[in-house]
Amino acid sequence: MASVTSYPLLEQIDSPERLRRLPESDLETLAEELRDFLLHSVARSGGHLAAGLGTIELTIALHYIFATPEDRLVWDVGHQAYPHKVLTGRRERLGTIRQAGGLAPFPSRHESPYDTFGVGHSSTSISAALGMAIAANEKGEKRKTVAIIGDGGMTAGMAYEALDHAGALGADLLVILNDNEMSISPNVGAISSYLTRLLSGRVYSTVREGSKKVLERMPPPMWELARRTEEHVKGMVAPGTLFEEMGFNYFGPIDGHDLSSLIRTLRNLHKLTGPRLLHIVTCKGKGYTLAEENPVTYHGVTPFDPKVGIQQGPQKPSSAMSYTQVFSQWLCDMAAQDGLLVGITPAMREGSGLVKFSECFPERYFDVAIAEQHSVTLAAGMACDGLKPVVAIYSTFLQRAYDQLIHDVALQNLPVLFAIDRAGVVGPDGPTHAGSFDLTYLRCIPNLVVMAPADENECRQMLYTGFLLNQPAAVRYPRGKGPGVAVEASMTALPLGKAELKRKGRGIAILAFGATVAPALEAAEKLDATVVNMRFVKPLDEDLVLEMAMNHELLVTVEDNVIAGGAGSAVSECLAYHGVSVPLLLHGLPDNFLEHGSREALLEQCHLNAEGILQRVKTYRARLPKSKASVVSSAAGTHG
């Protein structure tokens, strides 16, 4: 893909309204400019690349035909929405995407009126778009609603729940299925494209509906014969029978990179009403050969030179492993020792560190696609009959399977191990991917053991500990590297519910959980404070908590979780239950959603780095009543 040095057409487009003034003959050139701009902008700043390169033509066609923002476009997940951001007045800021104060990584209602629904998690678009279509109907508004969902998003049950409901209602809704995993041969594509233009035309639609009314008055066998004949003709070239059974008129598949075909078809579909589904076939990374050949590598990228691509050479030596790498190595080591171990992930093979496991133990590796609920109940079923399941999942995605976690695993006290990645502060992917809540929603569940490692080696030992337990267990760990502690090859089970005294001090005791232990130790040097690595959020080491309360003037809990219901709350509840009064400062994440930015910047913003912890403790201690015990919650400037 040759680089374009200037973008004369693209630079004219500051809104979709301006786009719609262009003659249709200019749109191919605009697509070339937009694709080149997107490639070089993301290559400079980092971000999601391959998906956006694959939706250039679709995005142009949608904004060209539909009167956005009055007509509603709802993007699923949002990885593919970078071209949408560019065409809706955010071109000059695209280089700031995922950075503190910059553009949000996904569509956000707070950022633009063209972002009609905030996304980040998969398979929500059809439900949200259906809600908007119903609202338009209830209010007597004539606007159109379009949901754009990828084939990956269609692996989740929620998408089919919404399709079934929309079809039953007969809602005026267009769903565009962006299929970037399959290809169609030129012959099938040509026939299918012709059929789609025919079926989406107003003449066919009028005849079809008129024929329905006539046939409905005739004997049922004749109606059924006509329906099956239509299905047979369409089924020869289109895999749309499932959608038709749900009440949708199905069109496609068509080439999602053929702008003229897209515009012609969308223009026809715009004139129609009722549930419609357009199936388009696209190529992830379209126009950039390296991304086309390896879309996984170019899905989310750090800055790189587009002339040479992402270099996959040997990594620079580092004293610190990432927590994901620690999990990956432990899983393979444990699987080699225990033939009953099985690994499960909901479409996060690379992100959760299961690539090596899937290659070494393919028969014991289960990627259930974007189906978090299924992944947890699948693990429960496996555990019932003697397998030892390990579910590798992001903190934010485990939220989607909360009922299954309670009802199917914990209630039956089944030995399922949850390896929870991206816990706490995550960073550039913003509030939709932050792991701010897991300690709160996990520690209230009976039978579940909850652990948070302070370093890489402890993570390995906690995973081993949880695996050996004959009950549900969760190990939650942050994104990125640990403090640099060497990981032992051996595995040793930790004493259940026992904390570790890391530093003896005077006056102040800091009870730190997980990744906050390292900065707490650094802050303690200037405070001469005692530091405890709590290790277990549940069961809590109540004996050590009470000992710290008896021997110190002030207790401080530190966690990378929201304070409400978190680890600090567990300490507070323990003290209250035992009737112990001691000044207690709860320090953690604030009571708001964390915006995007680097993990380091967000930790500083939340005062969870060493300096932030130090200042929080000093500020609180300075105003602490000498004769009165109190409990204070401290979260990035919010006390209460």
Swiss-Prot record:
Entry's EC annotation: 2.2.1.7
Q: How is the cofactor bound?
A: Binds 1 Mg(2+) ion per subunit.
Specify the domain of life of the species encoding this protein.
Bacteria
Disulfide bond sites? none
Q: Which cofactor(s) does the record list? A: Mg(2+); thiamine diphosphate
InterPro entries per the UniProt record, alphabetical? Dxylulose-5-P_synthase, THDP-binding, Transketo_C/PFOR_II, Transketolase-like_Pyr-bd, Transketolase_BS, Transketolase_C, Transketolase_CS
Q: Which pathway, per its entry?
A: Metabolic intermediate biosynthesis; 1-deoxy-D-xylulose 5-phosphate biosynthesis; 1-deoxy-D-xylulose 5-phosphate from D-glyceraldehyde 3-phosphate and pyruvate: step 1/1
Write out the entry's keywords from A to Z.
Isoprene biosynthesis, Magnesium, Metal-binding, Thiamine biosynthesis, Thiamine pyrophosphate, Transferase
Recorded GO molecular functions are: 1-deoxy-D-xylulose-5-phosphate synthase activity; magnesium ion binding; thiamine pyrophosphate binding
What's one GO BP annotation on this UniProt entry? 1-deoxy-D-xylulose 5-phosphate biosynthetic process
Question: Binding of thiamine diphosphate: at which residues?
Answer: 79, 120-122, 152-153, 180, 288, 372
**Catalytic class of the enzyme:** transferase
Q: Which CDD domains match?
A: TPP_DXS (cd02007), TPP_PYR_DXS_TK_like (cd07033)
| Reactions performed catalytically | D-glyceraldehyde 3-phosphate + pyruvate + H(+) = 1-deoxy-D-xylulose 5-phosphate + CO2
Q: What does this protein do?
A: Catalyzes the acyloin condensation reaction between C atoms 2 and 3 of pyruvate and glyceraldehyde 3-phosphate to yield 1-deoxy-D-xylulose-5-phosphate (DXP).
Question: What is this protein identified as?
Answer: 1-deoxy-D-xylulose-5-phosphate synthase
List the source organism: Nitrosococcus oceani (strain ATCC 19707 / BCRC 17464 / JCM 30415 / NCIMB 11848 / C-107)
